[in-house]
Amino acid sequence: MLSKSNQPSDALLDADFSFSQPPFSTLIDSRVLVALADQKFAHPTLVQAKAIPLLLEGKDVLARARTGSGKTAAYIVPAVQKILEAKADLSPASAEYQATRAIILVPTKELALQVSSFTKNVTKYCDGLVQCVDVAAGGASIQRVLLNDKPDIVISTPTKLLSLLQSKSLSLSQLSFLAIDEADLLLSYGFKDDLTRIMDPTSGWIPKLGVQGCLMSATLSDDVEGIKGLVLRNPAILTLSEPASASSLLSQHYTHTSERDKFLLIYVLLKLKLIRGKSIIFVNDVERGYRVKLFLEQFGVKCCVVNSELPLASRYHVVEEFNRGVYDVVVATDEGAGADAEEEEDVKQEESESEGEEDEDDDKEAEDKEKEAKEEAKPAPGPSKRRATSPPSKPNKRARRADPTSSLARGIDFTSASSVINFDLPLTSTSYMHRVGRTARAGQSGLALSFVVPRENWGKDKAVSIKSAEKDEKVFERIKERVKKESDSEIKEWDWKGRKGEIEGFRYRMEDALKAVTGKRVAEARREEVRRELLNSEKLKSHFAANPLDLSYLRHDAPLHPARQQTHLKHVPNYLMPKIAALPTGGDVTDHAGVGFSRRGRGGHRGRGGRGSKSGRGKKVDPLKFK
């Protein structure tokens, strides 16, 4: 079975140190330590144990550590501590007392919201001395209002921060701490130019002296090395390699399948509970996410859809509820906007070379045809002129660009996710590393399973086909090389315990469900979901502010029901169960063990006497006879 137990592990923790003992107990304010204890921070992780003391000493730090290793606390705790120390030496009446002293730059809105939430939890016992504001989302007018009080910590994306600095809505004259989280992603999203303009000494936005820098990244790419000189001065470089026990917590598998059989496999995995615990299913576009959700709903599998079309508050609320155990399955759209330009260029170059060789003869034929067409189409003499040939019309399909600051695959802290399923293989190896980084976090074990479509199987079924699957084999080779290089491990092929043929018994049920999920119904579900989430996000915002407990009753996994409902698909017959998986102890996987035939008629206890009469031959009753 594909089940993986989420057993806690100390592989990522440094047991030699404790937040309640020196040096941390003497370096960090007691109010911050109590807040950390409330969040179950007993021992620091490796990156926290190394980075926090260095940052508190005033040194710049460049740290490379995998996702889920606790990088957020490694820079937030020193930032809060330095603000508390600075305010302790100033009078509350002084003009310098309330000022923005720390800037946190992140690549996505979701990560900004998460960092803001963590910062508020860390400072909850500081009596309002440390104010934190997230300006990554929201309009300019709202951001100006938030910045009027000169918050101590501002969390933003580089583009938003640059806009605020240009409009003079934010002053950084008292800035003393600058942290960049997920630096490799921030650069891959195209924020390098914005970051360069922010750090330009001629602009005068960032003080030339007295600003401590911190760069956190999952990888140390050439781009990260390139901006090191912009942000850091003589930094301490931490390249933290995890012990073998930590890297082995993630079990990575793949299986070759057709585009249609993806739906069969995901149905078998989830409905028969071959993967236990909470799962994140990644797809490559928004339409694909709704198609998977509607398909799974046919079998009674509840799941949430998360994509950049939904309001930020809804997306973040889904993550919080997933972490609390409210939802077990999330279908997340990872459109990979702007990621890994170099790798994509290499793929395009390879494709262009192969296509160029094949199209040489076609180009020559096309040139000859053009010459013949020009000779035949010479304009006739006279005042009337032929209408000029119009340029080729643009395709009618509306090309929707993904929001580069919205992604659940990158930097978001999913806790206790036991598995990640790449329903659609990502476009690049970097995207793969960040997707599988959503599981096996904080010392817990995890499983990653990827569906790979062979080139010869791509495009055979247009109804369920996706363009990105055409490159699955090339991308997967890059993924295997990178996994081998960075973690010295291999992605193993999943053999389904030699019983993949027995899955065919479920195919007819998959076909029935997939036929009901048409393109029209997917579009209807897409509109309904956005409308519903906008209503929840905007109309009820004031209500939830006054009644925070009511927010826990807001559900995101409600069935969309635009597809034809087939209730029999929700129950798996018992004759199918033993062939693929053992029945779990304590009951059947199915909601109902079986439905037997009843001898009773539709009207209840009814016999030959007609409606309401007793069964068998009885004495006839004369309705006119007086009793």
UniProtKB/Swiss-Prot annotation:
Acidic residues: compositionally biased ranges: 340-365
GO CC terms, sorted: cytosol; nucleolus
Chain ranges for the short sequence motif DEAD box as given in the UniProt record: 181-184
Domain Helicase ATP-binding intervals: 52-238
Compositional bias of kind Basic residues: 599-618
One GO term (biological process): rRNA processing
Amino acids binding ATP: A65, R66, T67, G68, S69, G70, K71, T72
Its biological purpose: ATP-binding RNA helicase involved in the biogenesis of 60S ribosomal subunits and is required for the normal formation of 25S and 5.8S rRNAs.
Family to which this protein belongs: Belongs to the DEAD box helicase family. DDX56/DBP9 subfamily.
Descriptive protein name: ATP-dependent RNA helicase DBP9
Protein source organism: Cryptococcus neoformans var. neoformans serotype D (strain B-3501A) (Filobasidiella neoformans)
Taxonomy of the source species: Eukaryota, Fungi, Dikarya, Basidiomycota, Agaricomycotina
